[in-house]
Amino acid sequence: MDSNTVSSFQVDCFLWHVRKQVVDQKLGDAPFLDRLRRDQKSLRGRGSTLGLNIEAATHVGKQIVERILKEESDEALKMTMASTPASRYLTDMTIEELSRDWFMLMPKQKVEGPLCIRIDQAIMDKNIMLKANFSVIFDRLETLILLRAFTEEGAIVGEISPLPSLPGHTIEDVKNAIGVLIGGLEWNDNTVRVSKTLQRFAWGSSNENGRPPLTPKQKRKMARTARSKVRRDKMAD
């Protein structure tokens, strides 16, 4: 096992503990609390994958951080903070929408890279909006916290979430997963739109019809799907 992987996990565990203390003292806002909950799941997954105890890792992480802070001068800290770009946290969903439990009548789950896609295949002929909470840096999507698909009535019918055991994903991973989710929902004649905020920071533009640009691979897949649907309809007639 790579030593840097272990030390990174140990430091992340300690920093999560510090952030938890901030929340316990009622000093964190809603996005801060949201990230804390998501990171807790991620740390549990990483701990299981690495075979490391989180409590023990937290103590070692504390020692690493204390050693670094002892060696760090105030001037160096100021320079580091000034040169580090700050990320922003954007929310399409409310805390209630983000934390609400939901279930699927006809569940389908697919893993696309480091992201997990869940779709309720029982949903048909609905207008669906994709909303997401995510962080942005340099005006581009940095990290997806959670994406959910909502009907006009407010029901959750799909979801994209990071896999706790595979931390880290790219903007292309997110766009590919969204393409898979859209394709799965449109298979049952649903009309899917993507929020303008998500379009802007994932694709760099927003369309009035709510549809992001498709990659050549996604276009070919949708064409095959359409041909298959036409053949099924003809056989039914």
From Swiss-Prot:
A GO cellular component annotated for this chain's UniProt record is: host cell cytoplasm
Which residue ranges are recorded for the region named Disordered? 205-237
Residues covered by region (RNA-binding and homodimerization): 1-73
Q: Where does the source fall among the domains of life?
A: Viruses
**Record-level Gene Ontology MF annotations:** protein serine/threonine kinase inhibitor activity; RNA binding
Motif residue range(s): Nuclear localization signal: 34-38
| Span(s) of short sequence motif Nuclear export signal | 137-146
Annotated region described as CPSF4-binding, given as residue ranges: 180-215
One Pfam annotation reads: Flu_NS1
Entry comment on modification after translation: Upon interferon induction, ISGylated via host HERC5; this results in the impairment of NS1 interaction with RNA targets due to its inability to form homodimers and to interact with host EIF2AK2/PKR.
Q: Name one GO biological process term.
A: symbiont-mediated suppression of host cytoplasmic pattern recognition receptor signaling pathway via inhibition of RIG-I activity
Any signal peptide, and if so, which residues?
none
| Family statement drawn from the similarity comment of this UniProt entry | Belongs to the influenza A viruses NS1 family.
What the protein does comes down to: Inhibits post-transcriptional processing of cellular pre-mRNA, by binding and inhibiting two cellular proteins that are required for the 3'-end processing of cellular pre-mRNAs: the 30 kDa cleavage and polyadenylation specificity factor/CPSF4 and the poly(A)-binding protein 2/PABPN1. In turn, unprocessed 3' end pre-mRNAs accumulate in the host nucleus and are no longer exported to the cytoplasm. Cellular protein synthesis is thereby shut off very early after virus infection.
Q: Can you quote the domain comment? A: The dsRNA-binding region is required for suppression of RNA silencing.
According to UniProt, the name of this protein is Non-structural protein 1
Q: Which organism is it from?
A: Influenza A virus (strain A/Qu/7/1970 H3N2)
Gene that this polypeptide is encoded by: NS
